[in-house]
């Protein structure tokens, strides 16, 4: 194929949604679809209309709103499925019907109870029916990775003859390795006489962690469409991750010569975060490209290298996917160069402090606290702050009443004085936040709030992380407890103490 554009077919709303504990609402699906359109996705598989009335309506609404991406709906090789897909899609500016049937011996015999000739006949009939509605028909050979190669070649040849313009080769259970999968695509191009009449697509699952590798190996052998999902969302171990294949193609142009996509890479990160928020599926911190640690550096050796030249330890610029903040973490593994750079960024001349002394105290704080923030470093310099035990605000007691009007009562120690306040809120967490704000007489804005389980069982501990914004600066707080409300209160108090120390630093600077 002369054109080396790789078509990006996103199935977050269909295959990705199957991984969720509950279905997404119509407006949630539309929000994701519009984000995918803005990202530059070529084909959006919006759902499986015959599966439920809700899915039908979601596909129909997406089809009516999205204008720049082709909207696709899935159907089995059955007339009612294909007809329903068309009814949902017909309002779209551009639409595709995607029909499929299993072709592996295992699936044909044990699941469908049919022989290969029957499956072949069903496939051709389905494609012809779909073609009566649109020229844009995709056919998938389900479990192609475990289908005998001669059967697969014959099926693909006949599917193209029947009118399919895109032939999808799925590794449905993530069984193949990149060299195997590449060989399947290579054989298809060598043995199927009419293969130039269709676009070959691949749909790889990640059961053995090979989804991205398999997809990339396939395009080297002639495939020109990759089916994928945002954040690799999907059944079992997930699907090929859109962000991974797109950035691999963009980053490794030396190896993947001439290949490109129309994805607006600068929108990748915000799309990833949006999908994570809507689906309530957190992104693992170590997830390639979009994980919180993907561009973070805590090792002193790595930090020193990045400070001298980012390419020493970063093969992708964070800004390429829309991240514009520095993720150099200050921990006990950080070196003097990192601390010096942080102080320079805060406006301190190296002649105004003793780096060895500051670094020694920094290490003591980092050993106790874990991650150290820039405001902690300032407090360490001006206030000799080296321990969380030196906090101005201490949480003493907490009680919460849930119901129609959630109410919290918080008692805090400020120096030697105990102060108690009771407040209401939209929920118990907000009520606690309001109490702490009133007691401290500080009014920061809550910018981020997250809960993560740190253990399992009925006595599981939850960690709450919060980001508060005060006078244009963000402050982080962390709390850990078997009670999520108590953990929230601890996190708020931790952040409030950081704010208080920053105010004391400003006083010292002015003195």
From Swiss-Prot:
CDD domains: DRE_TIM_IPMS. One of its GO terms (biological process) is L-leucine biosynthetic process. Pathway: Amino-acid biosynthesis; L-leucine biosynthesis; L-leucine from 3-methyl-2-oxobutanoate: step 1/4. It is found in: Cytoplasm. GO terms for molecular function: 2-isopropylmalate synthase activity; acetyl-CoA C-acetyltransferase activity; manganese ion binding. Residues 6-269 form the Pyruvate carboxyltransferase domain. Keywords: Amino-acid biosynthesis, Branched-chain amino acid biosynthesis, Cytoplasm, Leucine biosynthesis, Manganese, Metal-binding, Transferase. Mn(2+) binds at residues 15, 203, 205, 239. Residues 394-511 are annotated as: Regulatory domain. It catalyses: 3-methyl-2-oxobutanoate + acetyl-CoA + H2O = (2S)-2-isopropylmalate + CoA + H(+). InterPro entries: 2-IPM_HCS-like (IPR050073), 2-isopropylmalate_synth_dimer (IPR013709), AIPM/Hcit_synth_CS (IPR002034), Aldolase_TIM (IPR013785), LeuA/HCS_post-cat (IPR054691), LeuA_allosteric_dom_sf (IPR036230), LeuA_bact_synth (IPR005671), PYR_CT (IPR000891). It holds the Pfam family HMGL-like. It is an enzyme of class 2 (transferase). Its EC number is 2.3.3.13. It comes from the Bacteria. Its cofactor is Mn(2+). Homodimer. Catalyzes the condensation of the acetyl group of acetyl-CoA with 3-methyl-2-oxobutanoate (2-ketoisovalerate) to form 3-carboxy-3-hydroxy-4-methylpentanoate (2-isopropylmalate). NCBIfam families: leuA_bact (TIGR00973), PRK00915.1-1 (NF002084), PRK00915.1-3 (NF002086). PANTHER family: 2-ISOPROPYLMALATE SYNTHASE 1, CHLOROPLASTIC-RELATED (PTHR10277:SF9), HOMOCITRATE SYNTHASE-RELATED (PTHR10277). Belongs to the alpha-IPM synthase/homocitrate synthase family. LeuA type 1 subfamily. This is 2-isopropylmalate synthase. The gene is leuA.
């Amino acid at each position: 194929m002369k054109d080396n554009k790789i078509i990006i077919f996103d199935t977050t709303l269909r295959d990705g949604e199957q991984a969720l504990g509950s279905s997404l609402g119509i407006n949630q699906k539309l929000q994701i679809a519009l984000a995918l359109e803005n990202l530059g996705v070529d084909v959006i598989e919006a759902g499986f209309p015959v599966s439920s009335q809700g899915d039908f309506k979601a596909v129909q609404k997406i089809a009516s709103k999205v204008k720049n991406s082709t909207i696709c709906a899935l159907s089995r090789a059955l007339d009612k499925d294909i007809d329903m897909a068309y009814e949902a899609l017909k309002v779209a500016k551009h639409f595709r019907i995607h029909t499929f049937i299993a072709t592996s011996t295992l699936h044909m015999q044990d699941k469908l109870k049919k022989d290969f000739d029957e499956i072949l006949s069903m496939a051709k009939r389905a494609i012809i029916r779909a073609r009566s509605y649109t020229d844009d028909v995709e056919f998938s050979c389900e479990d192609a990775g475990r289908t005998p190669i001669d059967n697969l070649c014959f099926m693909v040849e006949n599917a193209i003859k029947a009118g399919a313009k895109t032939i999808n080769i799925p590794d449905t259970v993530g069984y193949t390795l990149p060299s195997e999968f590449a060989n399947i695509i290579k054989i298809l191009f060598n043995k199927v006489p009419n293969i130039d009449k269709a676009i070959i697509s691949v749909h790889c699952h990640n059961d053995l962690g090979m989804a991205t590798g398999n997809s990339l190996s396939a395009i080297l052998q002639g495939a020109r469409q990759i089916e994928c999902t945002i954040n690799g969302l999907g059944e079992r171990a997930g699907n090929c991750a859109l962000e991974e294949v797109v950035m691999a193609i963009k980053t490794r142009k030396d190896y993947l010569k001439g290949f490109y996509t129309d994805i607006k890479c600068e929108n990748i990160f915000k799309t990833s975060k949006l999908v994570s928020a809507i689906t309530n599926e957190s992104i693992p911190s170590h997830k390639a490209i979009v994980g919180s640690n993907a561009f973070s550096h805590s090792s002193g050796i790595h930090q020193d290298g990045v400070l001298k030249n980012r390419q020493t330890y970063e093969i992708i610029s964070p800004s390429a996917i829309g991240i514009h903040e520095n993720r150099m973490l200050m921990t006990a593994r950080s070196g003097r160069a990192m601390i010096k750079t942080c102080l320079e960024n805060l406006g301190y001349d190296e002649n105004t402090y003793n780096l060895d002394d500051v670094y020694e105290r920094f290490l003591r704080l980092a050993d106790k606290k874990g991650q150290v923030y820039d405001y902690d470093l300032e407090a360490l310099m001006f206030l000799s702050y080296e321990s969380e035990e030196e906090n101005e605000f201490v949480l003493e007691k907490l009680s919460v009443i849930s119901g129609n009007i959630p109410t919290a009562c918080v008692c805090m120690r400020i120096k030697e004085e105990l102060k108690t306040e009771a407040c209401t809120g939209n929920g118990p967490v907000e009520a606690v936040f309001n109490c702490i704000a009133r007691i401290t007489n500080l009014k920061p804005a809550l910018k981020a709030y997250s809960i993560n389980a740190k253990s399992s069982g009925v006595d599981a501990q939850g960690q709450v992380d919060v980001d508060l914004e005060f006078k244009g600066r963000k402050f982080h707080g962390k709390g850990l407890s078997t009670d999520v409300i108590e953990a929230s209160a601890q996190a708020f108090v931790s952040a409030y103490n950081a704010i208080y120390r920053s105010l004391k630093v400003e006083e010292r600077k002015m003195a």
